[in-house]
Design a protein with these regions (language model features):
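Terminal, membrane-proximal amphipathic helices
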Residues: 1-90, 116-135
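Membrane-inserting effector segments that mediate pore formation, membrane fusion
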Residues: 82, 86-118
């Protein structure tokens, strides 16, 4: 079954701050999901640990995003073009685990770009129910 070409950062309507990294990540091949999901859990744990020194960190958003990435990966596997969908899910998860992406993750609004990437990918794949509120 043919795989669709990946959408550009502009096609997804990503914030300018997220476009360069998204474009780099879209060139990656999907790797080992168990390892990447472990990195996602570790990233959430770093947020939880950092909460002791900064009560304003977006820990709740990190938890929601970490959980939602697992659901996105699972749904991608059942998509009409699973190779394409899983590749985009991979990009969303990789974007999340990179601390210095469009914005420094460990700042008050540091996950806004991560949420924007996740939500844009969900919308592009037609998984509107997986989208997270950007608080």
């Amino acid at each position: 079954m043919p795989t669709s070409p990946p959408p550009s950062a502009r096609d997804l309507g990503l914030p300018r701050s997220a476009r360069d990294l998204y474009t780099r990540l879209i060139g990656e091949k999907v790797g080992a999901w168990p390892a990447l999901l472990a990195e996602c859990r570790a990233h959430v744990q770093r947020f939880e640990a950092a909460l002791a020194t900064n009560e304003f960190l977006p820990v709740a958003e990190a938890r929601r995003l970490g959980d939602a990435l697992v659901r996105l990966r699972d749904r991608a596997r059942g998509h009409r073009d699973p190779v394409f969908a899983e590749h985009l899910a991979w990009v969303a998860a990789r974007y999340f685990v990179i601390r210095d992406d469009g914005a420094q993750d460990f700042e008050v609004v540091g996950l806004d770009d991560d949420l924007a990437v996740f939500n844009a990918i969900c919308a592009h794949l037609g998984f509107h129910d997986l989208r997270l509120d950007e608080t």
